[in-house]
UniProtKB/Swiss-Prot annotation:
One of the record's GO cellular component terms: cytosol
Protein name: Argininosuccinate lyase
Location(s), subcellular: Cytoplasm
InterPro entries in UniProt: Argininosuccinate_lyase, Fumarase/histidase_N, Fumarate_lyase_fam, Fumarate_lyase_N, L-Aspartase-like
PANTHER family according to UniProt: ARGININOSUCCINATE LYASE
Family: Belongs to the lyase 1 family. Argininosuccinate lyase subfamily.
Alphabetized UniProt keyword annotations: Amino-acid biosynthesis, Arginine biosynthesis, Cytoplasm, Lyase
Entry EC no(s): 4.3.2.1
Keyword Lyase: yes
Amino acid sequence: MAFYRSWIGGGGDLVRRYTSSMADDVEIAEEVVKILKTHVAHLAEVGVIPREAAERIAKALDEVDYDALAKGGFEDIHEAVEKWVIDRVGEEAGGWLGLGRSRNDHVAAAIRLAALRKLAELKRGLAALRCALAKRALQYADCAMPSFTHFQPAQAITFGHYLLSIDELVEEFSRALAGVEPLLKRSPLGAGPAGGVKTPIDRRRLAKALGFEDVVGNALYASGSRFFASAAASIVVSFLVELSRYVDDFIRWNSPAIGYVKAPDSHVSTSSIMPHKRNLVTLEVLRARISEAVGHLTALYAVQAKIGAGYSLDLQEATRHLWAILKIAGEGVEVLRDFVEGLEFNCEKARLDAETYYATSSDTAEAIALSGVPFRRAYFQLAEEIKRGSAKLLSPEEAVKRPTEGSANPEEVRRAASARLIFCKTPAF
């Protein structure tokens, strides 16, 4: 049902279906109602609407049936909720709901609040993943393996060290999120359609009532910009792209041709014709969805490009890509955490590869140099011995005992993993 455009007439089902955002607005519906309740209460506080009308509107908002609204044929959630209120309390009271606001500033506020809610859920998932990584890193602190550069066996590390490198990524991502969240915590309310409103709204007071920390200063920018969404989405996708490299490692290592990882039974499927197969389907799907997230980010950017300052309905099409990215991240982190908790690592095979493929050569060359031989001479000497098959290399256990902070030294791995686990015992983490 068209409400705002009813005075124009026309439209019809085709136009309504094509332009309606109701299917996407489910993501912000609760935030929209919360903002409206706070807005109406503020209007009553500053004395521009009758307090009785505000109370009646608030009661109607408490009773909103979201399923019924979704079937109402509306342009968007804002129109649907206002029509719901007016139908229940009449225009004499419900008609005040539209004062001092625009869909432009209100949807920008709802997107910010919904994004903050979803990021909070994501951060809880990240905390659980970090705990799983730390526990397994402690378990595999002494488990020697080759690292890989250029997908060739490289320097000897331990699987515990490898797991802590994922934890390091999560920590950096958490820092990046902490940097972008202040952008989301700035309120656009009171900006109106582009240049503010005549109603004497105290923007800072209204912002504080909703949990915002600041206001977006310029009204045109406040209601028409989606920079905050692009910034948050780009950070999340950057994390996912980096995470996909580890996902790909696990998929490769699950192959019996490499044989480092045995995936949990719950994460594998088999072939319809080859019953021996143990396909790591959860991580294959995650790998694909991370690529989809890159596409969503590109679409989010592209929708905003060249539409001019101020709100256009193009922006309605951008928001769904933000939600898709956050969903991919949240579900992916949960799946990876469950995988890490249940995987088995073949330390015997990994150690054998570290030995077989000269993964201790750099440490051996360093050890020779530290005994007084110039490093490059030691390097070429060892290279010649490897070529002849006569090299006497350090064992993987000897090689990983490096003195540097953050190294694969099992003691360093235990120190770092134990430090992480301390936080796992506190609800705040």
